[in-house]
């Protein structure tokens, strides 16, 4: 998100509670991408995929969110590829063919799950460059004149009388001082890593 905002020249600020950008899953999923087309993969049955993801979630999901990923993840991949391949010369490794399917006998003896052709990764390029994907994004936004406020955690979301989010109160992990950041357009929260947050796990 920060890389996209930086590319568009938006006025934004990004905070990170850790001292450096964190690791991420080595591959990401995207449907019917340019990489999939180049590999000769058949188009995904999107209605069936929506049904499969909803089944896996026991129906406890917002299908609008799932549809957004199904319908827009290809554009996300094109954006990522434009940076990693266009700016850094990396090569996308796309998993397809027999490696991207369930064994045929699975449908005969077990539930016939739908597994979409979706895995994209840049692991070989990460290793060769000595830089992980998120580090490449950090380098990209810094080259465009932006920076990341590390060791800065979210303390509170601020709202106006109507309930609209107007900004945040952040707190420095170094000396504990508070920082008010006003947001004219909005606040984007990246809340991954649930297993590392005991309080959040208890709430769930």
Where are these regions (language model features)?
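Second-shell loop/turn segments in exported
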Residues: 36-39, 54-68, 123-124
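Flavin (primarily FAD) binding-site architecture
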Residues: 189-204
